[in-house]
Amino acid sequence: EHRFFHWHLEFPEVFADGGFDCVLGNPPWEKVKIIEKKWFNGKNDDIATSTSKTKRNKLINDLNVSNPCLYNQWKAALKDSELTAKYLLKSGSFSLSAVGDLNTYPIFADLCIFQILHPEGMSGIVVKTGIATDYFTKDLFSTILENDMLVSLYDFINSERIFPDIAPPERFCLLTISGSRRPSKESTFSYFNTNFRSLSDASRKYTLTKEDVNLINPNTKNCPAFHNIRDKKIILSIYRNCPVLLDETCGKNFWSIKYYAMFHMANDSKFFSENTYEKLLNDGYTLISGNIFRRNADAFLPLWEAKYFHLYNHRFGTFEGVPIERRFIKKAGTEKVTLEQKIAPDYSILPRYWLNHKDFIDRLEEMEYSQKWIFTFRDVTNTTTNARSAVGTISPCYPCSDKSPCLIFGDTSANNVILFQSLFSSIIFDYCVRISLGGAKFAWYILKQLPVLPPSTYTPALIDFIAPRVIELTYTAWDLEPFARDVLAEVGVAQWNAWFPANPVGDDGTPRPFVWDEERRFDLRCDL
């Protein structure tokens, strides 16, 4: 049933001689853990299409009564998956590859490279490009590099359907490995190919040493992806002149940043999945302050998702006007906020979920955070279709989904976060992000290894140039009044009025939001 296979028992004469001289393969790229929605697809549509993990679990448990045969099949598949994972994790045979969210392709790569290959042999395998760029494969890939075993890595995007049954955005690579007694001091790379003809383009091929990789990714030692030789030269120059955001090898964290993913859209769905616009209205809550529901002393706050904001814009997308049947589907799309809505300082976007204020306060206490505004960014992007890959902004401090994680600064002053906002939004930072992304996920481990200017770089003259432009771009609505008040408390009325003679502090001590003017905003962003 399980087709157990032992290499040494099957090929004793090969391993008596040290292993195979040549190993070629195209191993499967599958998660070991069962994906509920995928497994039930075609078996139970209600479970397969449910977007709520809480609801899915209930539907699965109900099968015990409604469809015990399917329920028993599910339990057997679940047990098989769990035992496979247990073997991979506990056997000691796959310590480099059985890490994190288990996938079969690094397991097979580990087998081909370190377990069945002769020390003077060669291996060529087709695997996902994530073997060189993903977080959970970092130990496997860095060991290959440290032992001078990587000959070449040629990356492909499947846009021309080299593999017809694989989605176009999928990336895979041809990985060539030498045995441990056949060292390769330099490795050849070529990324972002769409067909085999592009491999003959010399400008797209470049070499990297393990020292180059360690400079760019000191924490994980996984591989940067350059389009061409020029990209490589530019990036190496940047990293030689700038530190990374958080270098774990020496403990340097110039911006004193901590990362938080407040509420996981699947695992924390119990906090918000039932709290929809229609449900809260039906329960007697009233929408006030644009997007906050209240009933007496009880309040529900918007659950902030990545699709609601963009650079210097916390009112980018809204679910206002999106019918309920389209609001909760997979990859539900928002409506873009109109120019008229952006011009209105009282306008707030409408989310699709709300979260109880008390649950949010509990999470903020865990984070030890008390400000009424926060810096959040999108951790999912698309480098082939999106104009910008690094998208983050100062937003009202609302509950944030795991797809819009938050950065908390040791120096919590508004001025400090303003400077970081300008750095994060810069073209050169975005360029470095694009080079660092191996897929759509802009994860914390990637952000930690991006080059930054330390806060000490910012002279009074630079601050005087940057700060007023970031403030004007950011403070466009009354829901960010706490941010403006914190800025005012730090710089004083005289400095505010000197920066913004056309928008001075009012008699009530509160500056008004800046008028949304597309041409003016374009000029300010060009300045920055």
Task: Write out the residue ranges for each language-model feature.
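S-adenosyl-L-methionine
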Residues: 2-528
